[in-house]
Amino acid sequence: MNRLILKYGYPITALILAVFAWVIYVRISRGSQLTTLAVAAVIVWVLATPAFIYFWPRITVTGFKRAIVNRGFGGGPIPINTLYAEPKVSSGSASNASLLGAGTDDVLYVAGWLELRNGPLVLHTPDMAGRYYGVQFTDPSSSANFAYVGKRTTGTEAGDYLLSGPGWKGTLPNGMKQISSPNNSVLVIGRVFVKSDSDQPTAFALAQQIQLAPLNQ
């Protein structure tokens, strides 16, 4: 939803404002008077809509940080720079599902909140043997996904990825691919496909192997 707001919010707002302007122009050209309420409505729309488009995605991403760091997803708070893998798929019922996967019953979720101010982190992904998985990285200042690791982009073989913050000038270790974050804070959401109920333990074992470690460790 956040991506849709960012992509279409401003064009739709511009279209509605153009309609408002045309209506006002027509009324003035016909000698009609504009009511105070109509003028106030236009002013509120002009000011509030861009503010909503700008702040709402950032508020929702920050909500993930509070949920991850302060509450967790059933196993207690999750430390910063740590990934947590849900052991079971979320219920198909939105009322019983976790924050990560309302209505999604065929993937296990992995989540964490990262802070890169003290240096880069290394993301390790195991050999998924062709299984679908994905790890997306989100910039909380814009709610935009800036990188993706997974079957669709990097394949399913085991890999190590250096996640660095803005301005990092270190040396990339051999065999690693670099992911440059535009922000020192990063929201990470991962998914591992579950084929069936009997496959869930295998999928969970793989999800647990999606791990983070400091570069110097």
Language-model features and meaning:
Residues 8-217:
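A compositional/structural signature for long, glycine/proline-rich flexible linkers
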Residues 1-5:
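Short, strongly hydrophobic alpha-helical membrane anchors
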